[in-house]
Amino acid sequence: MKVLVVGSGGREHAICRAVAKSSRVDKIYCAPGNAGIAALAECVPIGAMEFDKLVSFAKDNAIDFTIIGMDDPLVGGIVDEFEKAGLKCFGPKKNAAILEGSKAFSKDLMKKYNIPTAAYENFTDAKEALKYLETAKFPIVLKADGLALGKGVLICNTLEEAKEGVRTIMEDKKFGTAGNTMVVEEFMTGREVSVLSFVDGKTIKIMSSAQDHKRAGDGDTGLNTGGMGNFSPSPFYTDEVDDFCKKYIYQATVDAMAKEGRPFTGVIFFGLMLTEDGPKVLEYNARFGDPEAQVVLPRMKNDIIDVMEACVDGTLDTIDLQFEDNACVCVVLASYGYPVKYEKGFKITGFEKFDGKEDYYCYHAGTKFDADGNIVTNGGRVLGITATGATLKEARAKAYEATEWVQFDNKYMRHDIGKAIDEA
């Protein structure tokens, strides 16, 4: 069969790699793809938001199955367009992708269906928000309602910081229309854990847990980013936590969406906070995380096409989802200055060191070919250096070893990815 993957990051590279392992797939296309994905798929110069062109391409090339990696096209309704054209497409429709597309919607959903989450208020008026903050308890969290590349969340320790945050989100519109509505949420303390799942509208199957590192700098300092590294599984995601989440969060979310007339098909990413009062939902994403996909998909034993088709066909209950009893760590190599200002276009060397090594992998995120055919940097997050091992400590040591194999001029990384492994 022919498969089209939509997106251009490390997550899509991980999806393409999983698809390439499927015995059912003869040909992979990726739109727009990147320099690393080009080794596995034919990259097509169509942007992820160019729905008409993507649908035409899928029709013209007799694509059997399309996988949407990114949040923007999902929230924009790309799956609806593919389905209207009679094409099979993996991901939630527009009315279900709102689970990620609007934080106000997801908070209201959790409140209505008693899914554990932080206390909150939604605001569409900056003056009302400021008035509310006058009597609030700090620290407090401000969230832009819409998509903001994972950067629309501000933790404010004082009233002054909160006032500045309201200005940033609602008045200066730093995140554009994503800030038309703002969620003010109680600050929760505990460990953050990500859990990925496959969903077919009624059945949910949990993949594995992972732990992200959002801040740009060592010691969780600096600005929020899309994610600087990850490890899977999380040692803090215990059987007890799993039991609680299965009872009160996972199926409850799928059932809530179905009851609202928004059946969810695709991947739900649960961002959880393990608090003293038990696990609570921090956020939902309507797709694989990045770099969560890079540490979870390499551990999956199943043929990804079998699982994704079952989601689309509503037969996920027939799938026995299985994962290797191992560990995986990803360290992101970024451009110095990310997530604010950074230079691009630097030549990258050392890729050949990964050749023939099953347990090491270099996922490409912000890369492209220059006019001379060299692979150069083309984004803030450039590569995801990933390694598997029998234990988290072994996988971490191997991933950091492999970060030395690749060189480019403004290479930057965190040196403490997986520090929490030592605290487990």
Descriptions of predicted regions:
Residues 4-5, 100-182, 211, 235, ...:
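Active-site nucleotide/adenylate-binding loops and adjacent lid/helix of ATP-dependent enzymes
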Residues 367-372, 376-424:
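Generic C-terminus detector
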Residues 246-268, 285-357, 370:
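Active-site "cap" helix and flanking loop/linker of ATP-utilizing ligase/carboxylase catalytic domains
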Residues 20-21, 36-38, 60, 90, ...:
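Solvent-exposed alpha-helices and their adjacent loops that cap or buttress functional pockets
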Residues 1-94:
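ATP-binding N-terminal substructure of ATP-dependent carboxylate-amine bond-forming enzymes
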Residues 38-40, 53-55, 98-104, 217-219:
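Short, charged, surface-exposed secondary-structure boundary motifs
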Residues 156-293:
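Internal nucleotide-binding/catalytic subdomain
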